[in-house]
Amino acid sequence: VTTLTSRGRQKSDRRSQLLAAAEKLIAERGFVAVRIEDIGAAAGVSGPAIYRHFPGKEALLVELLVGISTRLLAGAQSVLADNPDPGAALDGLIEFHLDFALAEPDLIRIQDRDLANLPSAAQRQVRRAQRRYVEIWVGALRELDPLLGEDQARVMAHAAFGLLNSTPHSMKPTSPEDSRGVLRAMTIAALSSA
């Protein structure tokens, strides 16, 4: 078992602080409008100190967007593994995505606005993970309704994401639980009515 040294923990903590600062600022202003010095100041370090942890501002964006795409895919795979029943699997996917959308509205904003600012290799990595995530939903929907066509299931999955990912635009910061109930009910209704 490997344990982090005190210095290793500090470095990991600083890296997390820099990512959190970058996430907040990029969500507020957009990637292009944020300077490396702004991120450093928000994290309590000088701009150049960031280079000890990341090669540049672009690397922060890569870590944010590739990171969330990878986490979403892994989470959905885990939901399926834990829920062999098709109905429970779909409910689990809805709850999992709701957890993400309510906890990470800044990442949704960044994804919507700044994906094009990623280097092409990172964009491909994000898109590949997103396609696999969509296919998990398509599979879950078709397992629940074997008569459902693949294209229709894909449209339904994307519609569900549109509803669930509306949180940065529709949710007041003080009402995540109210929003959860409404978004869950609307998503279930939308997926059930097709």
Task: Report residues per predicted region.
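Amphipathic alpha-helical segments used for helix-helix packing
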Residues: 102-121, 169
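Helix-turn-helix
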Residues: 17, 21-59
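N-terminal intrinsically disordered/low-complexity leader segments
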Residues: 1-13, 20
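Amphipathic alpha-helical packing segments from all-alpha helical-bundle domains
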Residues: 70-73, 120-145, 154-158, 181
